[in-house]
C-alpha cells in the first residue's frame, strides 16, 4: 500500500495507515496487524486461535524487566483473566512490566471503529494508540507471546537479527 507520502512530516501515522488500508481495500472483516519492522521466531496461528476463542480484539504481551526498555514501548496492564485494563505508549512511569509489541488482532467490529478512535483523539503516530483507546471500551484480551520478536529499528539491529535469527521454531507454532 502506498499512501503517496514522501516525507516524515506528511506521513499519516500508523493508525491512519491502518484506516487507509481499510478504506483502500474495502476491508470489512477481522484483521491481523503487525508492524513491518518486526521478525518473529514463532507462528501466529496460536494468536489467531486465541483471539477467535475469546471473540475479542487481542494484543500480545511479554514480560520486560527493564524499566528503561518499558519507557520505549507500549506498556499494558492486564487482569488475571488476560483482560486489558489499560495501555500507555512510552510511559515515563510504567505501571506494569508487560510490554505490548505491535501485533494486534482486531475483530471486524473493532476494526470499523478506528475512524471513531481517530476522531476521539486516540493518537495516530504509534500503532498502540488505537488499542489504548479501544481498551477503554472493553473487552480486549492480551496473550502472552510464545516466543521472541526481533525489532529492526536501525541498520545495526538489522545486522544483529541477521546473525541471530534462526527462523520460526517448531515448538512455538502452537
Residue ranges and their predicted role:
Residues 1-78:
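Conserved beta-loop-beta/alpha segment of the NTase-like Rossmann-fold superfamily
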Residues 48-52, 83-151, 155-174:
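Catalytic-core segments of class I nucleotidyltransferases/pyrophosphorylases
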